[in-house]
Swiss-Prot record:
It comes from Clostridium botulinum (strain 657 / Type Ba4). One of its GO terms (cellular component) is large ribosomal subunit. One of the primary rRNA binding proteins. Required for association of the 30S and 50S subunits to form the 70S ribosome, for tRNA binding and peptide bond formation. It has been suggested to have peptidyltransferase activity; this is somewhat controversial. Makes several contacts with the 16S rRNA in the 70S ribosome. SMART domains: Ribosomal_L2 (SM01383), Ribosomal_L2_C (SM01382). GO terms for biological process: cytoplasmic translation. This is Large ribosomal subunit protein uL2.
Length: 277
């Protein structure tokens, strides 16, 4: 997929880029797979802001995605490649031989008319989903389960892929996009290929209005707030933050402070951390 620029009719338009969406084949989603979404504005049931910078944005319908791929040994034909406003990857509408329709995450190279299959006996072909036990070492995969039958949880965003590094007994070693190598049980399923929309990471949003359409509100610097609103706030004019290191709005150290629990149960499944050389 290509990225297009714009004539500099305004200063923000000069830097702005956008995907050309060449792979998209239809603009009308499948009605039976849509669910209404209610906006929260980042507020909880008490009306208090629990997540900042959320609000507004274009109306969306949620597309029900099949992350389990549990309809085994029944071929499904790709009918369309569609845009999904709820994720960075494109989605594919597939119709099974028995007539059932489902959405799946579209991998790179999947085209209208292609056939995808799930199940242990599936071929090693882009878009097919099978247990890691049946995938050859070295294969590039995405949509990886952490618990068998729960549905894919890892490597689902645009342009991402993982690689199967080794298999030994009940566990496999998978290198994730971050560089982390992790144990994953061989019964867990994964899909062959790389997630679509690879150019997403080089798109320049360019202007605030596009972020507002996405439902993202402005981020105010702590140094321009009052001292009762942020640890960096207060002072006369442009004052120092008044701390040895930057702080979050709630007073905890920011920028590099480790927030992961040091005795997390999943530590035993991490073979190599993403920062290790």
């Amino acid at each position: 997929m290509a990225v297009k620029g714009f004539r500099p009719t305004t200063p923000t338009r000069r830097e702005m880029t956008m995907c050309t969406f060449e792979e998209i084949t239809t603009s009308t989603p499948e009605k039976s797979l849509l669910v209404s979404l209610k906006k929260s504005g980042g507020r909880n049931a008490n009306g208090k802001i629990t997540v900042r910078h959320i609000g507004g944005g274009a109306k969306r319908k949620y597309r029900i995605i099949d992350f389990k791929r549990n309809k085994d040994n029944i071929p499904a034909k790709v009918v369309s490649i569609e845009y999904d406003p709820n994720r960075t990857a494109f989605i594919a509408l597939v119709v099974y031989a028995d007539g059932e329709k489902r959405y799946i995450i579209a991998p790179v190279g999947l085209k209208v008319g292609d056939t995808v299959v799930s199940g242990p006996e599936s071929d090693i072909k882009v878009g097919n989903c099978l247990p890691i036990r049946n995938i050859p070492v070295g294969t590039v995969i995405h949509n990886i389960e952490l618990a068998a039958g729960k549905g894919a949880q890892l490597v689902r965003s645009a342009g991402n892929s993982a690689q199967l590094m080794a298999k030994e007994g009940d566990y496999s070693q998978v290198r994730l996009p971050s560089g982390e190598v992790r144990y994953i049980r061989v019964e867990c399923r994964a899909t062959i290929g790389v997630v679509s929309n690879q150019t997403n990471e080089i798109v320049n949003i360019g202007k605030a209005g596009r972020k507002r359409h996405m439902g993202v509100r402005p981020t105010v610097r702590g140094s321009v707030m009052n001292p009762n609103d942020h640890p960096h706030g207060g002072g006369e004019g442009r004052s120092p933050i008044g701390h040895p290191s930057p702080r979050t709005p709630w007073g905890k150290p920011a920028l590099g402070y480790k927030t992961r629990k040091n005795k997390k149960y999943s530590d035993r499944f991490i073979v190599k951390r993403r920062h290790d050389k």
